[in-house]
Amino acid sequence: PDTEAVLSIHLFGHPARLDKIRTVCEENDLLLIEDACQSVGTKYMGQVTGSFGDISVVSFGHKKHIDAGGGGAVLTDDSAIAQDIRRAEKNIPRRDDAYISELFDAYRDIYYAIDDLKELATEPHALYESLPEAFHDLFQYGFKSKWIPNIRNGLNSLDEICQVRQNHATIYRNRLQHPKIVHPD
């Protein structure tokens, strides 16, 4: 009864079963939020991921399909939701690039230190979970117009980017053959 939305995550280019999820959302008057950060360009039932939900998010961060150096986008066709998003975006602080770079380096160093020591820690997941709060500024900063050319280039090259990723996936699938390995469809 307290649920207002369903967050559907498409992981490693594999779309969630959006037809079924969408039906549940419609039957229960729930918003569908799609996390399409790792599935930009992927199609499900002939439609691109990120276009099924009431709200969708995509990332332009490091190693994503469109790597603009950071940031992301919230997408919606609903004008009321779009207005709320624009209002909220105005309150996101603008951060200095050098500060963000310094934070990112420190975050990465601590993340991998935890990873190296996780066998010794009694609750390593708690250490990982503490990072977003400790590095709050790294996860919330305003959009930078300097990212626009990289985003535009990524959108224009999206088919090629997706093909390269598909080629890599095929290589992994072909080389990682073992009875205990189950590859996704």
What is each stretch, according to the model?
Residues A5-I9, H14, L18-K20, E27, ...:
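PLP-dependent aminotransferase class I/II
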